[in-house]
């Protein structure tokens, strides 16, 4: 159980990193937007789309079902909230707090699932030909998902006896701030 959860939590850390990178690039103020537009506008536009789609894919991945059919009646276990919840339940460790966080994570999934299924993971013909906008949601809903994700990891850590890990902030050497500094001629360009 502990190894499974630690591997799951690493996926959650990666989701946070992807979210932070996208936010730090594209939601950090006009000076940074102008710098991106003056250096490589096409690249940054494409990177924004890639990061959003990848974030949606990862958020759906951790909220997929506990197993996936692979043919001939066989299944593979998924490293997901549902799989961990099932393991916790079997051991009598599934608390109300963990259930509540699971429900919060799955509420967000409902908002983005069509985008994953019809545009990101599959090329749905109707979506491609009619330019249907899928997966739209408020920033507050994305932030709530991340909050549920952190609370879920903390609550599971507690019941299985794993040291909690705060991964709410993922910046460090070589991050977006250093990129903007390099693009800005060596001068630090803080978010606004």
Cite the ranges covered by each PLM segment:
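Histidine-centered, metal-coordinating catalytic motifs and their short helical/loop contexts
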Residues: 102-130
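Amphipathic alpha-helical interface segments
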Residues: 1-108, 135-192
């Amino acid at each position: 159980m502990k190894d499974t959860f630690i591997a799951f939590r690493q996926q959650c850390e990666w989701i946070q990193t992807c979210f932070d990178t996208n936010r730090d690039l594209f939601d950090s103020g006009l000076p940074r937007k102008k710098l991106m537009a003056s250096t490589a506008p096409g690249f940054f536009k494409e990177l924004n789309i890639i990061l959003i789609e990848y974030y949606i894919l990862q958020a759906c991945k951790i909220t997929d079902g506990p197993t996936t059919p692979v043919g001939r009646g066989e299944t593979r276990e998924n490293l997901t909230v549902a799989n961990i919840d099932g393991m916790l339940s079997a051991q009598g460790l599934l608390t109300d707090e963990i259930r509540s966080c699971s429900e919060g994570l799955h509420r967000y999934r409902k908002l983005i699932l069509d985008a994953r299924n019809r545009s990101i993971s599959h090329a749905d013909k109707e979506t491609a030909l009619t330019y249907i906008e899928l997966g739209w949601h408020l920033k507050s809903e994305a932030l709530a998902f991340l909050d549920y994700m952190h609370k879920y990891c903390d609550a599971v850590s507690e019941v299985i006896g794993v040291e909690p890990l705060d991964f709410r902030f993922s910046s460090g050497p070589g991050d977006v701030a250093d990129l903007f500094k390099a693009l800005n001629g060596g001068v630090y360009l803080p978010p606004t």
